[in-house]
């Protein structure tokens, strides 16, 4: 039986409430004088808003390092002072969302918004990398439901596609919404989405990045902990 619009709205509302619950918890992790990596996406945006409330209400003294144009605008509108990656010596904590999280390994797939290259640079540079997710994002095996995005230099898109086809995958260039043609990232590149067997996240992450023309892929094998929003509480998963 087809799901009704009311049922779809209820599922979306439940997911949104879980995201807000975990965003509020994550904002409490930030301490005075920290440099904070600000992730991108719907859950990260909620975190940025909650963190902005603390900056305004508690006069929390921090700097944020945005990972996309979207997170930069959200942080600015929320009252969070910003600093660029080359201006800060180190990042104390990076807090970001995920499209899919493996429960056993805490490896992730990110990049549904096409920001994974800048996210990975900031997240991996941080002393602590914390991921926010609702329980619907948890999976037993990474990549079963979510394609891995590859940010690809336009000059090399055809050779990257051919290489992925040689690997018996089914790659697809991500199309834009509201415009004709492909999605173009903040870095001026294209996105190729590919479903691929991921037995070892770190090995697959490295292998995809070794394809000439691939700038970065959406597998994140390094994560310190995941805050999971459930109907009862926020669970903390650690390696």
Swiss-Prot record:
Its EC number is 5.3.1.6. The keyword Isomerase applies. Pfam families: Rib_5-P_isom_A. GO terms for molecular function: ribose-5-phosphate isomerase activity. InterPro entries: NagB/RpiA_transferase-like (IPR037171), Ribose5P_isomerase_typA_subgr (IPR020672), Ribose5P_isomerase_type_A (IPR004788). The keyword Transferase does not apply. Substrate binds at residues 40-43, 96-99, 110-113, 137. CDD domains: RPI_A. GO terms for biological process: D-ribose metabolic process; pentose-phosphate shunt, non-oxidative branch. It catalyses: aldehydo-D-ribose 5-phosphate = D-ribulose 5-phosphate. One of its GO terms (cellular component) is cytosol. Keywords: Isomerase. Pathway: Carbohydrate degradation; pentose phosphate pathway; D-ribose 5-phosphate from D-ribulose 5-phosphate (non-oxidative stage): step 1/1. The active site is at 119 (proton acceptor). It comes from the Archaea. SUPFAM superfamilies: D-ribose-5-phosphate isomerase (RpiA), lid domain, NagB/RpiA/CoA transferase-like. Catalyzes the reversible conversion of ribose-5-phosphate to ribulose 5-phosphate. Homodimer. Belongs to the ribose 5-phosphate isomerase family. HAMAP family: Rib_5P_isom_A. This is Ribose-5-phosphate isomerase A.
